[in-house]
């Protein structure tokens, strides 16, 4: 484990709860998981995807009907890792609410728009970026050709996913994703990537009565 990772882990705050059996300490992310909140933070890669998928499956096993909240602040990353999270989101039974805080770029934007219809949000100062997949290859010419064919096939498949979740025509998605395309939260809403931009958390009925 790198020194940077060790330092980051040591900075995760702990929270203490009073229970019938006395005090119990949780790291902040474990405590939020009890509230069915999962974070996608940083680059999307295999280790992070494994943890996110495991949390999704655990929360489904705990309650297959109760909503799960996915908070996203990610520059994107590995397509296959992102697709593992995406497929798990579609596979499990609980509805999933997504919220962008900071940024949702590349695969992060796909996971943002993959939330349940009507439950895809962004904070007002977040930014969303969409683009086509990229990759670099080396080796024999025939191998490079096969990799190129695969990435073109992957590009089409990702375009179809954006079409499904945004309601845009395929040609619009293809043209928009041709280069890095940055959007404000409001622009992402107009494009169909999200359903609403929220600045303040709505009060619950219990809070209103109090």
From Swiss-Prot:
EC number from the UniProt entry: 3.4.21.92
Main location: cytoplasm
One protein family per Pfam: CLP_protease
First-tier enzyme category under EC: hydrolase
GO MF term set: ATP-dependent peptidase activity; ATPase binding; serine-type endopeptidase activity
Subcellular location: Cytoplasm
Function: Cleaves peptides in various proteins in a process that requires ATP hydrolysis. Has a chymotrypsin-like activity. Plays a major role in the degradation of misfolded proteins.
Binding partners and assembly: Fourteen ClpP subunits assemble into 2 heptameric rings which stack back to back to give a disk-like structure with a central cavity, resembling the structure of eukaryotic proteasomes.
Protein name: ATP-dependent Clp protease proteolytic subunit
Species of provenance: Bartonella bacilliformis (strain ATCC 35685 / KC583 / Herrer 020/F12,63)
Lineage of the species this protein comes from: Bacteria, Pseudomonadati, Pseudomonadota, Alphaproteobacteria, Hyphomicrobiales
Gene assigned in the entry: clpP
